[in-house]
């Protein structure tokens, strides 16, 4: 049996909270073993905090369960509890479920290839309000969409290279615009920072992760980059004309730098610290996924 104490991070922009960048083959800090017969099972409880450019604080407590079905097959279940606090109020609730299946395509004594297929399932419609005023996506606990996820990774003792696709399948039901907030007396300087997101169609995302690990005795250090490229612009309903429109500057690259540290106390217990910081951001994020930096703490029990 193996237990791990970890401090983990979600990328600063691009992935949803506990999003597809941490599903299956795309997860950071994946354990590598040259034991060809190993089957990994784990339960993780993690907590993180993220800071947005608008001084909102986003919290997520996530249950992450991984079950090795065979030596080549595994399933993962994730459920976050989300909370947001900022200039527009405080909200909290259960986030979206993530389900994935991972298959090891090839494993040798030196490397392995993994592939993941999965989905994000909404437990809400992203339509929460505060004092009868619709909240922007930064304050929603759910993305409000069913998402298809596909990913693949190459893993060695020193390197992790992964790529993936997240494909939203429907429009959410968010109704945020600045007008009702301004009518109720909220400063336009505050509320106009948030992009309107009425009936938002989120764009498709492609992820690429590269991570280098150095291990000396009980100490390990990792450094990496995580890029998310939005293939197409988000689409929403204009609050004035009521017509559909593309959101300018909502597509393109978001890049995050990652730095990690782990210390193995013994074969059963390891402490990990990872910090992520935004390097390149998209100028407009009506989906509420932008973070300037994110850091968290978690406990993993492996058996």
Where do the PLM segments sit?
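Outer-membrane beta-barrel biogenesis signature
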Residues: 10-52
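Short loop/turn motifs that connect adjacent beta-strands in outer-membrane beta-barrel proteins
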Residues: 14, 27-35, 72, 106-113, ...
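Outer membrane beta-barrel transmembrane domains
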Residues: 39-46, 50-51, 75, 186-303
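Residues that define the transmembrane beta-barrel architecture of outer-membrane proteins
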Residues: 57-61, 91-97, 111, 142-148, ...
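Transmembrane beta-barrel domains of outer membrane proteins
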Residues: 64-66, 102-104, 151-155, 162-164, ...
């Amino acid at each position: 049996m193996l237990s791990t104490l970890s401090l983990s991070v979600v990328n600063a922009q691009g992935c949803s909270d506990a999003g597809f960048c941490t599903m299956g083959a795309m997860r950071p800090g994946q354990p590598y073993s040259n034991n060809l017969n190993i089957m990994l099972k784990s339960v993780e409880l993690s907590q993180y905090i993220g800071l947005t450019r608008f001084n909102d604080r986003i919290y997520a407590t996530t249950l992450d369960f991984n079950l090795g079905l065979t030596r080549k097959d595994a399933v993962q279940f994730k459920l976050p509890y989300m909370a947001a606090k900022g200039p527009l109020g405080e909200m909290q609730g259960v986030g979206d479920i993530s389900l994935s299946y991972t298959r090891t395509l090839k494993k040798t004594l030196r490397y392995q290839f993994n592939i993941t297929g999965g989905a994000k399932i909404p437990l809400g419609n992203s339509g929460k309000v505060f004092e009868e005023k619709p909240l922007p996506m930064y304050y929603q606990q759910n993305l409000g969409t069913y998402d298809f996820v596909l990913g693949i990774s190459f893993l060695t003792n020193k390197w992790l290279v992964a790529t993936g696709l997240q494909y939203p399948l429907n429009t959410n039901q968010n109704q945020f615009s600045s007008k009702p907030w301004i009518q109720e007396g909220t400063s336009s300087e505050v509320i106009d920072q948030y992009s309107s997101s009425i009936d938002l169609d989120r764009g498709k995302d492609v992820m690429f992760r590269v991570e280098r690990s150095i291990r000396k005795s009980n100490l390990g250090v990792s450094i990496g980059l995580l890029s998310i490229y939005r293939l197409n612009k988000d689409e929403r309903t204009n609050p004035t004309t009521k017509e559909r429109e593309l959101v300018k500057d909502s597509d393109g690259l978001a890049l995050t730098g990652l730095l990690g540290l782990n210390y193995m106390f013994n074969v059963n217990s390891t402490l990990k610290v990872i910090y992520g910081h935004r390097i390149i951001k998209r100028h407009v994020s009506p989906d509420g996924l932008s973070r300037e930096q994110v850091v968290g703490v978690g406990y993993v029990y492996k058996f």
